[in-house]
Amino acid sequence: MSEQAKLDPEPWAYHLLGLISPLLVISGNLLGVYEPIYAAMGVIFIWVVGPVLDVLLGETKVPRPPRDSGTPFEVLLWVHGILQLVVMGTFFWFAFNTGLNIWLVVGALSTGLSAAASAIVTAHELGHTRPRSPSWWLSRVLLFSVNYLHFTTEHNYNHHRWVATDKDPASATKDESLWHFWIKTIPGQFKSSVEIHNSKGKTGFNNPSYRGLALQIVTLLSLAFIPGYLGYFDGIPLTVGWIISSAISILTLEY
């Protein structure tokens, strides 16, 4: 292999393979309305097929320098973000038609696993953009779709500064178990985000972290009870499914 070939940036088109997960989940949610087993497509690909391919393909041996232009990757972030909104829309349609049963849980797992990348990881990248820009707002919508609105605040202002220290709730200790880390990091990151806003003078209900939490709770309760009260449809399955998918996406992120 020539020296020039070793220095060529990796083709950005390879990263289109990352769209397989959300596209499979969208398909599974839609087909699952007619045959529920299709709702497992995302789980099977992400937890079974993906890891097997990862082992078989192995690690790349070719050094890949950064590309001169980051535009293709910025566009790809937007594609992931838009697909996440479609994923959630199709999941709500699936939950509406399926009701409370084991297939709702399966569909929520597929949806949540996809959202861990297409929602939270994408929001993490977009969260570094200029506040109140279109990309910044998309990151807020994506975090709302998994009920984790405070994430970018804690990540950008605390984790980046104190990573791998006792001041970072998102860093695990050497001998810490996964379960203990989950129990520590999730409330710890919310508490950290509250403290960050407090330090900027945004206390009480002026604190965006508290406002975000209130918005998430009110939205979940409204979805659960208002449609049924008005006689439109039972919102409980949609709410339960949303909570499960949010939980699995958050746990996957913090894994």
Protein language model annotation of sequence segments:
Residues 87, 110-120, 131-134:
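Membrane-embedded alpha-helical core segments of multi-pass
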Residues 142-144, 252:
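Short, surface-exposed linear patches
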Residues 1-113, 126, 145-240, 244:
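Non-catalytic, topology-defining segments of multipass membrane proteins
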Residues 239-255:
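Internal helical hairpin/lid segments
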Residues 133-141:
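Post-HEXXH active-site segment of zinc metalloproteases
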Residues 61, 119-133, 157, 251-255:
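Juxtamembrane/interface segments at transmembrane-helix termini
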